[in-house]
Curated annotation (Swiss-Prot):
The keyword Hydrolase applies. Its EC number is 3.1.21.-. InterPro entries: His-Me_finger_sf, HNH_nuc, NUMOD4. Induction: Expressed in the early phase of the viral replicative cycle. Pfam families: HNH_3, NUMOD4. The keyword tRNA processing does not apply. It is an enzyme of class 3 (hydrolase). Keywords: DNA-binding, Early protein, Endonuclease, Hydrolase, Nuclease. The lineage of its organism: Viruses, Duplodnaviria, Heunggongvirae, Uroviricota, Caudoviricetes. This is H-N-H endonuclease F-TflII. SUPFAM superfamilies: His-Me finger endonucleases (SSF54060). One of its GO terms (molecular function) is DNA binding. Endonuclease that cleaves only one strand of asymmetric DNA substrates thereby introducing interruptions into the template or coding strand.
Length: 193
């Protein structure tokens, strides 16, 4: 078999890939079989260090023949024609998650809405208040005293908005911090009033 168009896959040097998605094992001296994953993407399975490792073809191709810096990179590989089975090099584009999300949203006939994140100025969906990167993360620094203050003086809903957790998440956080039933705070309210 001629291997003139094949290139080494950097993360798996015992395997080679052609621009057409053929994967060759130098261990077994044969081409690997493509399989179809549950998401509809073709993949191959390598045997490395006693384990099976499955990797989708479009990421392997982008890694070796395009500008995907590594297989673990957070960059995504887009199929221009949206056909998951078309992994020809001219159909693959490496892009950021945000760019991929916007492209897919527009291709599906939805509008982005022209809204921008107030923190970083990235374009966001019309129903979003911030982009995913700027969305407030739950703070492990929330104390039981803070929760009690907001709930006693206002409500669970107001407390959850102020502290950046869902109402239910805040109740679970209170229980994990104190071991008490979150309803016990309401009992304090009735005792105070």
């Amino acid at each position: 078999m001629k291997l003139e168009n094949f290139k080494v896959i950097p993360e798996y040097p015992e395997y080679l890939i052609s621009p057409y998605g053929e994967v060759y094992s130098t261990k077994s001296n044969k081409l690997l079989t493509h399989h179809l994953g549950s998401a509809g993407y073709p993949f191959v399975t390598f045997y490395e260090q006693g384990k099976n490792v499955s990797i989708v073809l479009h990421r392997l191709l982008a890694r070796v023949f395009k500008d995907l810096p590594s297989l673990e990179s957070e960059l995504e590989v887009d199929h221009k024609d949206r056909n998951k089975l078309n992994f020809s090099l001219d159909n693959l584009v490496v892009m950021t998650k945000q760019d991929h999300r916007i492209k897919t949203t527009v291709e599906r006939g939805h509008t982005i809405g022209g809204n921008k994140c107030p923190y970083c100025n990235k374009q966001i969906n019309s129903s979003s208040k911030t982009c995913f990167d700027c969305k407030p993360k739950s703070s492990p620094d929330i104390t039981a005293e803070q929760i009690e203050y907001w709930v006693i003086n206002y409500s669970w809903v107001k407390a959850s908005k102020e502290l950046g957790l869902s109402d239910n998440g805040l109740r679970k956080r209170y229980k994990s911090l104190t071991g008490k039933d979150p309803k016990s705070i309401k009992k304090k309210v009735s005792q105070v009033g």
